[in-house]
Curated annotation (Swiss-Prot):
Pfam families linked to this entry: S-AdoMet_synt_C (PF02773), S-AdoMet_synt_M (PF02772), S-AdoMet_synt_N (PF00438)
Chain's gene name: metK
GO CC annotations on file: cytoplasm
GO biological process: one-carbon metabolic process; S-adenosylmethionine biosynthetic process
CDD domains noted in UniProt: S-AdoMet_synt
UniProt name for this protein: S-adenosylmethionine synthase
Chain sites annotated for binding K(+): 43
Enzyme Commission number: 2.5.1.6
Length: 383
């Protein structure tokens, strides 16, 4: 039997890079709420005592960037200087300018359906039937651990927790089927007055055990809880944070390929984001239809051109029909032009800040997670 291990990681909403992502998407949402046709590319940098918000925006909306930034940081949980970052006292610098008219002329069209892609690029979407949400298990449970850390921090169950945390889960596979969890890493920022033994017990009993399925844990499973022994200095005081630096955490935890484009701070005309969402939608519907156990779709674009320059599909030997048939079905059932996919998934609205922590995929509140095309795909495939 073929055995292998596979590992994915996640980070909490208080991780510096995720603070940046959430601020960028908070700005995007605030603009889209007033101006759904806005062009937004918002980047954020955070470091001890400061936030820099920059980028290019074309919009009729007005947003109080400083207040929005402070509100976002406050909701994450950085509310006191003893954490090294305080929403009410940090400096907020605004360096937002206008989008280049050279880009606008390539994107805007008299016929909206012929809207060109905002840039060239390649994007991937992926789905797998190894979990109920049709996501890879390693990233799914890595997210669940840091999400649980946030919940028990905010509700006071473990009051000594602080916002910054990271998780990592290693799954064991035989013949591409999960047989157990080999290793778990969870590092969480904490107040200075908690003993290491109490921290380990609290994390194990309150975070790890309630989240990970018992049938995948064994006496051989390895646990690494705050393995350095101390994690008091964290967040932007420990490391600077930048928008778009957690692209594998945001997607499939390394189980699928990645085109390189980040998501946060970008409006739906940026295919880095919208086409990656559409590619997940397509791949998930193919797997939900039973046409493959695993599916990875690649789509690519040229700046200013509406039609994708390529569509390709890989089913890793699990397809019930040929990949050529799948591509034909995709072209028949999904409009992957920038305007088409924005309309198909109703993307021109303020839904993005919620995506900026704990993964963009595998969360059924988002429209690209619907499986409403599965039945029609299955019927047209003749299954």
């Amino acid at each position: 039997m073929a055995k292998h291990l596979f590992t994915s990681e996640s980070v909490s909403e208080g991780h510096p890079d995720k603070i940046a992502d959430q601020i960028s998407d908070a700005v995007l949402d605030a603009i889209l709420a007033q101006d759904p046709k806005a062009r937004v590319a918002c980047e954020t940098y955070v470091k001890t005592g400061m936030v820099l918000v920059g980028g290019e925006v074309t919009t009729s909306a007005w947003v109080d960037i400083e207040e929005l930034t402070r509100k976002t940081v406050r909701e994450i949980g950085y509310t006191h200087s003893d954490m090294g970052f305080d929403a009410d006292s940090c400096a907020v610098l605004n360096a937002i300018g206008k989008q280049s008219p050279d880009i606008n002329q390539g994107v805007d069209r008299a016929d909206p359906k012929e809207q060109g892609a905002g840039d060239q690029g390649l994007m991937f979407g992926y789905a797998s039937n190894e979990t109920e949400i049709l996501m890879p298990a390693p990233i799914t449970y890595a997210h669940a651990l840091v999400k649980r850390q946030s919940e028990v921090r905010k509700n006071g169950t473990l009051p000594w927790l602080r916002p910054d945390a990271k998780s990592q889960v290693t799954f064991a596979y035989e013949n591409n089927k999960i047989v157990g969890i080999d290793a778990i890493v969870l590092s969480t920022q904490h107040s200075p007055d908690i003993a290491q033994a109490d921290l380990i017990e609290g994390v194990m009993e309150t975070i790890i055990k309630p989240v990970l399925p018992a049938q995948w844990l064994s006496k051989d499973t390895k646990y690494f809880i705050n393995p350095t022994g101390r994690f008091v200095i964290g967040g932007p005081m420990g490391d600077c944070g930048l928008t778009g630096r957690k692209i594998i955490v945001d997607t499939y935890g390394g189980m699928a390929r990645h085109g390189g484009g980040a998501f946060s701070g970008k409006d739906p005309s940026k295919v880095d984001r919208s086409a990656a969402y559409a590619a997940r939608y397509v791949a998930k519907n193919i797997v939900a239809a039973g046409l493959a156990d695993r599916c990875e779709l690649q789509v690519s674009y040229a700046i200013g051109v509406a039609e994708p320059t390529s569509i390709s599909i890989e089913t890793f030997g699990t397809g019930k029909v040929s990949e050529e048939v799948l591509i034909k079905l995709v072209r028949q059932h999904f409009d992957l032009r920038p305007y088409g996919l924005t309309e198909m998934l109703n993307l021109a609205r303020p839904i993005y800040q919620a995506t900026a922590a704990y993964g963009h995929f595998g969360r059924n509140e988002f429209p690209w997670e619907a499986t409403d095309k599965a039945e029609a795909l299955r019927a047209d495939a003749g299954l």
